[in-house]
Amino acid sequence: MISDESDRFNPRDPKPADAGKPSKSAKRREARQLATQALYQWHMARQSLNEIEAQFRVDNDFTDVDGAYFREILHGVPQFKTEIDNALTPCLDLAIEELDPVELAVLRLSTWELLKRVDVPYRVVINEGIELAKVFGSTDGHKFVNGVLDKLAPRLREAEVKAFKR
């Protein structure tokens, strides 16, 4: 196989100014991961959101995290918990109280994004929810989360889902 010279690494080539810096989507993914853990803690321990946020900011390196988005999720999900749970309930085969707490945290976060962050495409919300469930949930938790979000997205983002499926 003949190699193309242009594919070779040249240490003299200038690096782009943002080389090595995480993208906006990567920073948001990190924010979602930390927020999932923080929401789980809020659900289980019923600590104040400000205490949880302060603890997470001390215990975690926020260099590669969208800290504002983390805060928005952490405070937004509890603020709209009733609306979120009411939206989720018709898409569940179990009562909310019977859900695994990790999967509940993921579903609440994803539902909040579908309801309150219409700038985030529904397909991104579903994918991120699945990835969070793979990282933090039970063995097949991501399949459950996927099924619920697939039912929920058309209910909350009907026009967007229809436009994509054309």
UniProtKB/Swiss-Prot annotation:
GO cellular component term of the entry, any: cytosol
GO molecular function: RNA binding
Keyword Transcription in annotation: yes
Pfam families: NusB
Disordered, as annotated region: 1-30
Compositionally biased tracts (Basic and acidic residues): 1-18
Biological process per Gene Ontology, one example term: DNA-templated transcription termination
InterPro entries reported for this sequence: NusB-like_sf, NusB_fam, NusB_RsmB_TIM44
Keywords of the record: RNA-binding, Transcription, Transcription antitermination, Transcription regulation
Membership in a protein family: Belongs to the NusB family.
Function: Involved in transcription antitermination. Required for transcription of ribosomal RNA (rRNA) genes. Binds specifically to the boxA antiterminator sequence of the ribosomal RNA (rrn) operons.
Record-linked NCBIfam families: nusB
Xref: HAMAP family: NusB
The protein's name: Transcription antitermination protein NusB
The organism of origin for this protein: Pseudomonas fluorescens (strain Pf0-1)
Gene assigned in the entry: nusB
